[in-house]
């Protein structure tokens, strides 16, 4: 409760800073992706090979910029960064995803810091495992022009592993399929539990995430979806009133 009371006066200033970023980044016309028509061709989800956590001051208040790929070590780094910066009011996210379970763990760490807001600023993209870090926030803000991008979580994208199992013969392929099915079922259960705990509608999984194809094919190359402002609010992904 102490964190929530301390941060409340800062929310307006941070929102103004995010709004300024929105006006600066939203001016250029965005080229859309023909394969994924709801999304831009080149989402700005950072090229950092591991997520960098940088405390900065925006609008007179401290925020934590979380930018880059999610790796297994992120939860520990995030916990340390928040402990070292107890006056951080918001976490701003852009990421191409990465380790799904590390994303879930990082989201739970954010939720354990009561009153810590997560934000996807205009022009920034939060994809795949980044979704679950974002959903740990309370409240959660997606600025107009910010991108919450989903896909079907899968291990079938590891083509080298699949090719190797096929080369080894039928039994190896059967074992790989069994491993994939087991891991997919476990991850789906974990994701479902996570959404319940974070207050996000489980329909986000059934109506959006699980409706995306795991792999593109000759007829339809779409594998990801960018949610609209209406959708992120209807599924309670964003739960602010800004």
Language model regions located:
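Glycine-rich beta-to-alpha active-site loop
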Residues: 115-157, 161
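Extracytoplasmic/secreted envelope proteins and their assembly/folding machinery
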Residues: 75-79, 103-107, 130-131, 135, ...
């Amino acid at each position: 409760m102490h964190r929530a009371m301390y941060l409340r006066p800062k929310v307006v200033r941070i929102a103004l800073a995010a709004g300024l970023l929105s006006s600066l980044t939203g001016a250029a016309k965005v080229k859309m992706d023909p394969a994924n028509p709801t999304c831009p061709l080149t989402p700005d989800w950072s090229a950092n090979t591991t997520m960098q956590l940088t405390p900065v001051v925006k609008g007179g208040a401290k925020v934590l910029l979380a930018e880059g790929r999610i790796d297994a070590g992120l939860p520990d780094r995030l916990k340390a960064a928040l402990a070292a910066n107890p006056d951080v009011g918001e976490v701003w996210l852009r990421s191409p995803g990465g380790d799904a379970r590390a994303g879930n763990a990082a989201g739970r760490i954010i939720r354990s810091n009561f009153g810590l807001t997560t934000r996807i600023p205009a022009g920034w993209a939060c994809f795949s495992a980044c979704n679950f870090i974002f959903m740990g926030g309370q409240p959660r803000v997606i600025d107009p022009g910010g991108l919450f991008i989903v896909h079907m979580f899968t291990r079938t994208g590891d083509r080298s592993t699949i090719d190797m199992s096929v080369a080894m013969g039928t039994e190896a392929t059967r074992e790989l399929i069994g491993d994939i099915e087991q891991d997919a079922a476990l991850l789906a259960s974990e994701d479902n539990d996570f959404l319940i705990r974070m207050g996000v509608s489980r329909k986000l999984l059934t109506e959006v995430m699980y409706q995306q194809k795991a792999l593109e094919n000759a007829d339809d190359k779409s594998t990801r979806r960018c949610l609209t402002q209406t959708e992120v609010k209807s599924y309670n992904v964003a739960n602010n009133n800004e």
